[in-house]
């Protein structure tokens, strides 16, 4: 006969029940999860079984069941200080943050307690040192340490999101990850090619979605989030469903988002009265003869869009030492207008009547096998198979023209990752593994004519082939790699790590005769190999100082976008360059951290210097066999004379910078946090500016916990200005999007003005089932733009959020 033995799990700080605590019997291999009230019944465990109580936000506890009495309260100590955080992404294995020599950041649901990011791009701004660029409503391109787009690696659940057509300008692919499906997001700063391979120059952003937990007791959990932005007319509806059983578990996430046109701020502290105002617009459904007046110029028309996301995860227990996780994700958006393009002026008129991205679709299915049975060569291992299907397109029609350019890209990406983990008795560990990826790119392009009648425009059946954005006949890109990382505890206070990775990349691109811009290129084969390494050391003093130093190298092998893209912007045409080679980054950094005795307060500073060899950048490029114009630097493209540029290896470059962060917690539940970021960079050979070098920026927040049910936060973020002579010549940073000034001789661009905004957030918990959140952003209605952005940020706006369980 078995008797009930119920206990309650309590937070040791705020004395509230802790739900979702996993209890695992070491000898019985049985497991349970505490309910929403922190209650759990231990009757199924033998009295001599050793129970392990674990939760991602609390320190684990081991205790023999016989020492626990009916009705006991077990107090869990929260993981509240930086040194005790567990990081999953560095070296693709769990590691205590106190032993990591690189700068890392972690974003969890607790960090978002007083806010609801609209997209995963917005989510990344909560980490220190990350700037997000936008050119349209459905955008968000993160920049880390002066690197952006395909120089920052995005990963979701262990699968690379970067693919063969990730470009070097700005990307919006991060918005295809639903922020409400995430359990945690980790950011590794600086070159991280040992663990992740090509593209990880500026750093790695690793999204971890929620995983369902297996439970001996059948259990349902259902949660919802409803959000409405009063001024911007944004609506977000998110639903979670989780089911746990003895042998399997399921997690389902469904989300729909509808974003209205972005309304900019009205207070122009920068002094430019007309900058960014959307005074006129065109009706894209009509053959435009003239501009239409916008009754509210602060409303940036054509920035609205919609998106829905779906995720399904299954967790199957295969044996006592293995499980399988099936992961299905799908994201789909509406058409997304390119706001900066629709406001491009040429000869006094709008250049485009239409310019939009077609629906951006990302589908992923993966199977992850975890094995925890100890063997001679490993204690644990993981095997991950993944397939991704990506679809994107671009559509544009020039002002007063009856033909539309359509460029359509489809990708199929296959990948395999195999990772092994081995702990040794001499306080050392080894992580090693293998990776293979294959990208197949299908690129199409055509011109479609419209018929004009009294009732308006109508699509015709007239289609004409035009040059594709990427190789039209064939586009393949593959990587194969092997890596290892060894870690050793020298003493209780110090440790070091050393790692190495060998990567081989292969690219094949082929154009058909109708799509050749450069007649010297019709078939390109490229093969590159690279060895990258990392070396780190950490020292932790007895008085809570941490000193870390790290050397790491990274590389980026040219992908199909780098070598074979054809793209026109502002009269400049990007053309293919078959001679492009990989670029390399060599990074040295030093970190210093100080923690209080109770670990509640911290201060940290990280400084780094990155040397870039064979830097890939855009430069003027002559197509020697072109005779369409007398000027060797231009060609005729789409009936217009344009300047030709290409990606080239432009010698050596450098980036250096520093970041500072602090956290102060007071006994009466006041919490103050802040971080500052400084970056500089240029070319070693001619000291020309590099793209994506952000001006000095930072943020501060002041939080007060009123009681167990309510708290509020006041936050402040800012950015200094950037002068026009510090913008890159390739145009990646959008100097033309900055204010125009008269310098006494001519009209010139002034560069990006400085700005600062304040936000107020407050939450109230009605019960364990209902919670409200109110966010008043940009309180003083300041007009500003993020650096390199082609769209103004929202002005004062109020967001209302309701979270509920059912």
Question: Which residue ranges define each predicted feature?
Answer:
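Outer membrane beta-barrel strand-and-loop segments of large Gram-negative receptors
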Residues: 409, 413-419, 575-581, 587, ...
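N-terminal periplasmic accessory domains that precede
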Residues: 68-75, 120-123, 140-143, 154-155, ...
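Flexible loop and strand-edge segments within Gram-negative outer membrane beta-barrel domains
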Residues: 301-307, 317, 321-378, 387-411
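Surface-exposed extracellular loop regions of Gram-negative outer-membrane beta-barrel proteins
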Residues: 334, 389-393, 504-515, 525, ...
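Transmembrane beta-barrel wall of Gram-negative outer-membrane proteins
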Residues: 232-259, 264, 269-334, 361-363, ...
């Amino acid at each position: 006969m078995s008797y009930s033995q119920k206990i309650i799990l309590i937070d040791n700080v705020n004395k509230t029940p802790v739900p979702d605590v996993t209890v695992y019997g070491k000898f019985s291999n049985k497991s349970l999860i505490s309910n929403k009230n922190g209650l759990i019944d231990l009757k199924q465990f033998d009295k001599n079984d050793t129970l392990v109580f674990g939760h991602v936000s609390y320190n684990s506890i081991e205790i023999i069941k016989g020492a626990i009495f009916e009705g006991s309260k077990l107090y869990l100590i929260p993981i509240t200080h930086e040194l005790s955080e567990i990081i999953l992404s560095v070296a693709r294995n769990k590691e205590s943050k106190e032993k990591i020599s690189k700068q890392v950041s972690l974003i969890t649901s607790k960090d978002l307690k007083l806010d609801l990011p609209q997209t995963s791009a917005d989510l990344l701004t909560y980490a220190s040192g990350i700037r997000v660029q936008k050119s349209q409503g459905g955008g968000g391109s993160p920049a880390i340490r002066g690197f952006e787009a395909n120089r920052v690696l995005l990963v979701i659940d262990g699968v690379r999101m970067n693919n063969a057509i990730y470009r070097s300008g700005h990307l919006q692919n991060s918005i295809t990850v639903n922020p409400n499906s995430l359990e945690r997001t980790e950011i590794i700063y600086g070159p991280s090619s040992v663990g992740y391979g090509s593209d990880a120059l500026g750093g790695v952003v690793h999204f971890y979605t929620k995983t369902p937990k297996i439970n001996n007791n059948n259990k349902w959990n259902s949660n919802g989030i409803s959000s409405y932005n009063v001024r911007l007319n944004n609506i977000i509806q998110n639903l979670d469903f989780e089911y746990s059983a003895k042998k399997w578990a399921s997690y389902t996430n469904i989300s729909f988002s509808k974003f209205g046109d972005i309304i900019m701020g009205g207070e122009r502290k920068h002094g430019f009265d007309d900058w960014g105002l959307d005074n006129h617009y065109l009706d894209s459904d009509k053959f435009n003869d003239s501009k239409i007046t916008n009754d509210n110029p602060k409303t940036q028309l054509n920035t609205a869009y919609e998106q829905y996301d779906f995720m399904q995860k299954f967790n199957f227990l295969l044996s006592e030492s293995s499980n399988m996780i099936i992961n299905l994700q799908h994201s789909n958006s509406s058409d997304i207008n390119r706001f900066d393009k629709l406001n491009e002026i040429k000869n006094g008129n709008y250049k485009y009547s239409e310019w939009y991205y077609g629906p951006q679709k990302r589908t992923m299915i993966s199977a992850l096998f975890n094995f925890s049975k100890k063997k001679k060569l490993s204690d644990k291992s993981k095997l991950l198979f993944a397939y991704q299907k990506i679809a994107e397109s671009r559509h544009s029609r020039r002002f007063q023209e009856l033909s539309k350019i359509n460029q359509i890209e489809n990708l199929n990406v296959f990948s395999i990752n195999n990772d092994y983990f081995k702990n040794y008795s001499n306080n050392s560990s080894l992580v090693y593994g293998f990776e293979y990826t294959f990208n197949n790119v299908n690129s199409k392009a055509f011109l479609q004519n419209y018929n004009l009648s009294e009732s308006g425009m109508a699509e015709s059946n007239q289609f004409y082939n035009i040059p594709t954005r990427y190789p039209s006949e064939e586009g393949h890109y593959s990587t194969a790699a092997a890596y290892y990382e060894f870690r050793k505890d020298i003493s209780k206070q110090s440790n070091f790590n050393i790692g190495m990775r060998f990567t081989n990349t292969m690219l094949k691109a082929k154009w058909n005769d109708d799509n050749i811009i450069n007649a010297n290129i019709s078939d390109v084969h490229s093969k590159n190999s690279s060895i990258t390494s990392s070396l780190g050391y950490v020292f932790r003093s007895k008085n809570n100082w941490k000193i870390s130093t790290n050397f790491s190298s990274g590389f980026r092998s040219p992908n199909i976008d780098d070598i074979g893209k054809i793209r026109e912007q502002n009269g400049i045409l990007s053309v293919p360059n078959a001679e492009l080679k990989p670029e390399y980054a060599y990074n040295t950094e030093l970190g210093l951290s100080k923690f209080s005795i109770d670990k509640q307060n911290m201060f940290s500073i990280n400084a780094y210097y990155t040397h870039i060899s064979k830097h890939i950048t855009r430069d003027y490029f002559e197509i020697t066999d072109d005779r369409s114009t007398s000027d060797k630097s231009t060609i005729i493209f789409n009936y217009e004379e344009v300047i030709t540029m290409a990606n080239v290896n432009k010698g050596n470059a450098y980036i250096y910078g520093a970041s500072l962060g602090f956290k102060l917690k007071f006994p009466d539940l006041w919490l103050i946090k802040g971080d500052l970021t400084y970056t500089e960079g240029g070319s070693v050979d001619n000291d020309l500016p590099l793209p994506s070098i952000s001006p000095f920026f930072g943020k501060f927040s002041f939080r007060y916990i009123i009681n167990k049910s309510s708290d509020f936060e006041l936050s402040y973020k800012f950015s200094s200005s950037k002068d026009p002579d510090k913008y890159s010549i390739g145009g990646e940073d959008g100097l033309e999007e900055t204010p125009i000034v008269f310098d006494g001789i001519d009209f010139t661009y002034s560069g990006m003005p400085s700005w600062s905004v304040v936000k107020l957030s407050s939450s109230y918990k009605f019960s364990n089932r209902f919670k409200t959140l109110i966010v008043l952003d940009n309180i003083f209605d300041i007009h500003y733009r993020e650096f390199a952005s082609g769209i103004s940020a929202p002005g004062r706006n109020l967001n209302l959020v309701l979270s509920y369980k059912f």
